Amino acid sequence: MGKGGNQGEGAAEREVSVPTFSWEEIQKHNLRTDRWLVIDRKVYNITKWSIQHPGGQRVIGHYAGEDATDAFRAFHPDLEFVGKFLKPLLIGELAPEEPSQDHGKNSKITEDFRALRKTAEDMNLFKTNHVFFLLLLAHIIALESIAWFTVFYFGNGWISTLITAFVLATSQAQAGWLQHDYGHLSVYRKPKWNHLVHKFVIGHLKGASANWWNHRHFQHHAKPNIFHKDPDVNMLHVFVLGEWQPIEYGKKKLKYLPYNHQHEYFFLIGPPLLIPMYFQYQIIMTMIVHKNWVDLAWAISYYIRFFITYIPFYGILGALLFLNFIRFLESHWFVWVTQMNHIVMEIDQEAYRDWFSSQLTATCNVEQSFFNDWFSGHLNFQIEHHLFPTMPRHNLHKIAPLVKSLCAKHGIEYQEKPLLRALLDIIRSLKKSGKLWLDAYLHK
């Protein structure tokens, strides 16, 4: 019935009952070939559309058969715009007698968290200070300039080369935190501007891929520390994490490596090799295999700029070695910072928690200081960042006291540590998991 329908026809259309579904029925549709999810009690069939999902089909697929309301709000700053894509996918609603939450999730925590989000919006905590991000970009470009001037003025001796490498590694680490801001759509109101600048920062300043990052990182945020859903805990049999995985490996007599020594070999193959070996290879292969030609062009522009800048000082082979040494230094920085908030927390199979509880279970904070903020790209406020991923990082400290209060109200632990302890806890966690594996391997 179009706009030309008469009043009687419109009334008849409104009287048509909307299909309703129980959670039992919805939860059956959690397969790769059959996906339903719920947002604000409305049921959507995303089976075919998930392939077109800008964030990737896996991240949205992880919520198949579940309520995705809070995840939907967390990832999308412009709800009115993305809501247009949902309308054709609507197939019904939750039955009136059904609770809004699936799997017995805590409705009171969810209600309080949504009230907290409304408070954050009323406090304008999702509003960006653009000068802040311009200064971040300026200091990255300044570091790049200082690095070039050092080798230009002092020559390519060992001391000047080491200084230049450390300055460039610092620039790369800071560019990594900055691309993270744009990737989360936390800078500009319009997603398209965030996407454009994201490609510039991660592509031209770092030589990486925006699509690759989106595909991995959004899954991590959607289901942090959940095996088979969070790619950040897929260690390719190199490490065993948490309590469940090492025991399972031990029971099955899986011994790809001596995991009881993983807290020792972590120093050899974790921080040194993640970026220069694994990520660098994976990023290039992903862009080629998935034909991400725009991302590849941005990445190539980085390598062209780097080699034009440093081949005159080191030659082709020397510049290539220099690049990988910078990646080696940056990798240490990246691994220690990114793992201190997650690897020490609960890592397990899907437990179907509410959004607030799932993020608090998987994340912890590091104490605030000017250095900690800069060193970690404000990921020392990992809890707040995970709860509100589109909130500009300069506002995370403002919402932290309210998050702490909500945790106290519901008896949820809010973990915050000094930086050194957070770093050392990585090793303690690996050692603990290694012991669990050895015990299960020998005795179960």
UniProtKB/Swiss-Prot annotation:
> What GO terms fall under cellular component here?
endoplasmic reticulum membrane
* Motif Histidine box-3 boundaries: 382-386
The UniProt entry lists membrane topology as:
Multi-pass membrane protein
User: In which residues does the motif Histidine box-2 occur?
Assistant: 217-221
Domain called Cytochrome b5 heme-binding: residue spans? 18-95
Q: Where is this motif: Histidine box-1?
A: 180-184
GO MF entry, a single one: stearoyl-CoA 9-desaturase activity
Q: Write down the InterPro entries for this protein, in alphabetical order.
A: Cyt_B5-like_heme/steroid-bd, Cyt_B5-like_heme/steroid_sf, FA_desaturase_dom, Fatty_acid_desaturase
Q: In which pathway does it act?
A: Lipid metabolism; polyunsaturated fatty acid biosynthesis
Pfam families named in the record:
Cyt-b5, FA_desaturase
Keyword entries, A-Z: Electron transport, Endoplasmic reticulum, Fatty acid biosynthesis, Fatty acid metabolism, Lipid biosynthesis, Lipid metabolism, Membrane, Oxidoreductase, Transmembrane, Transmembrane helix, Transport
Q: Where are the transmembrane segments?
A: 132-152, 158-178, 265-285, 306-326
This entry's Enzyme Commission designation comes to: 1.14.19.3
Q: Which reaction does it catalyse?
A: (9Z,12Z)-octadecadienoyl-CoA + 2 Fe(II)-[cytochrome b5] + O2 + 2 H(+) = (6Z,9Z,12Z)-octadecatrienoyl-CoA + 2 Fe(III)-[cytochrome b5] + 2 H2O; (9Z,12Z,15Z)-octadecatrienoyl-CoA + 2 Fe(II)-[cytochrome b5] + O2 + 2 H(+) = (6Z,9Z,12Z,15Z)-octadecatetraenoyl-CoA + 2 Fe(III)-[cytochrome b5] + 2 H2O; (9Z,12Z,15Z,18Z,21Z)-tetracosapentaenoyl-CoA + 2 Fe(II)-[cytochrome b5] + O2 + 2 H(+) = (6Z,9Z,12Z,15Z,18Z,21Z)-tetracosahexaenoyl-CoA + 2 Fe(III)-[cytochrome b5] + 2 H2O; (11E)-octadecenoyl-CoA + 2 Fe(II)-[cytochrome b5] + O2 + 2 H(+) = (6Z,11E)-octadecadienoyl-CoA + 2 Fe(III)-[cytochrome b5] + 2 H2O
**Gene Ontology annotations of biological process type:** alpha-linolenic acid metabolic process; fatty acid derivative biosynthetic process; linoleic acid metabolic process; long-chain fatty acid biosynthetic process; unsaturated fatty acid biosynthetic process
Q: Where in the cell is it found?
A: Endoplasmic reticulum membrane
Q: SMART domains under this entry?
A: Cyt-b5
What role is this protein assigned? Involved in the biosynthesis of highly unsaturated fatty acids (HUFA) from the essential polyunsaturated fatty acids (PUFA) linoleic acid (LA) (18:2n-6) and alpha-linolenic acid (ALA) (18:3n-3) precursors, acting as a fatty acyl-coenzyme A (CoA) desaturase that introduces a cis double bond at carbon 6 of the fatty acyl chain. Catalyzes the first and rate limiting step in this pathway which is the desaturation of LA (18:2n-6) and ALA (18:3n-3) into gamma-linoleate (GLA) (18:3n-6) and stearidonate (18:4n-3), respectively.
Write down the PANTHER family for this protein, in alphabetical order.
ACYL-COA 6-DESATURASE, FATTY ACID DESATURASE 2
Q: Which family does it belong to?
A: Belongs to the fatty acid desaturase type 1 family.
What protein name applies here? Acyl-CoA 6-desaturase
Originating organism: Pongo abelii (Sumatran orangutan)
What phylogenetic lineage does the species belong to? Answer: Eukaryota, Metazoa, Chordata, Craniata, Vertebrata
Q: Which gene encodes it?
A: FADS2
